[in-house]
Amino acid sequence: MNKNKLPVRFTGQHFTIDKVLIEDAIKQSRINQNDTVLDIGAGKGFLTVQLLQKAKFVIAIENDFELITHLKHKFKQTQNIQVFGCDFRNYKIPNFSFKVVSNIPFGITSEILKILMFENMESFQGGSIFLQLEPAKKL
């Protein structure tokens, strides 16, 4: 993967590299060694790396082929992660409890929130989700 790969803006793709923001999101979500965490739109894995240190298991979901390849290579020796190459809207949500800490693709914010909060209320245990200002104001 080109390490200088830029986000594909028209898809709502963006990369969060701010370590303070990432650490704060993880702290706010109260992740512990018993949690399974979904990272929706895992991108280059900046957030994923930090989640792996706190959670029991991380499910990284990414739709960009180049980034999927990158994530699978980056975490090939890591036991507590599974990388799924798909659009989150087509991902089968687990039947067990999970949290979400994610820098979600902005273009599908409302769809992601609907899937998590209304279609999977029994499994979704909260977390931290980065939102673009405009969709956040609509909530």
Regions picked out by a protein language model, each given a short descriptive name:
Residues 1-139:
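Catalytic cores of RNA-modifying enzymes
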